[in-house]
Amino acid sequence: MLGIYARLIAMALFATMDALVKWLGDSYGPFQMMLFRSAVAMVPLYFLVRGAGGLKVIRSRAPLLQGLRILTGFGSLFGFFYVFPRMPLVDAYAISYAAPLFMVALAVPMLGEVVGWRRWSAVCVGFVGVLIMLEPWTISVHWLSLVVLLATFSYSVSTVLTRLISRVSTVDSA
């Protein structure tokens, strides 16, 4: 039950953050909002790291992969923070639902996973659902849609890299 509540709280916080980014986007740039978001995130992170044993627990055995993960995560966050004030959130969310398609496709070369026809079928059905939500046949593609797609791809790479890094570097491996 605790996991369900944690997930619900996390989703509510992400939705609140996205709405705040949209609302504050006319007054603040993406970098300013990213800085504030990161500063707020540092407070609970400080207590988590401190409780787990200090800075030694965040030392990575894969620093280059970790650096690439940080860059792709930064690119994703910047892309979303740039786009949210400039286009309807519902459209940005719908485009970002392409992430599972990217993740499954990236898991094959990056993680060496074998993806069977059932999983590909499920991903394709989900992607068709995304297309139905977007109704691309009724609108022209705006360049901001491409920014969301790039941010989504960057997010997907970051997520797959996190899984790859977890194979060699864990909190206990420091």
Give the positions of each predicted feature.
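Structural motif at transmembrane-helix junctions in multi-pass transporters
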Residues: D26-Q32, G79-S96, R167-D172
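Transmembrane alpha-helical segments that form core, pore/gating elements
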Residues: K22, P30-F31, L45, S140-A174
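Specific transmembrane alpha-helical segments of multi-pass solute transporters/efflux pumps
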Residues: T16, G53-V90, I132
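Juxtamembrane helix-entry segments on the extracytoplasmic side of multipass membrane proteins
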Residues: M1-L2, L35, I58-A62, E135-S154
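Membrane-interface interhelical linkers
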Residues: M1-I9, M42-L68, W117
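Hydrophobic transmembrane alpha-helices of multi-pass small-molecule transport proteins
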Residues: R118-L134, Y155
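C-terminal transmembrane-helix exit sites in multi-pass transporters
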Residues: A99-S121
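Hydrophobic/small/kink-forming positions within alpha-helical transmembrane segments
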Residues: M11-A19, Y46, I70-F78, P100-A105, ...
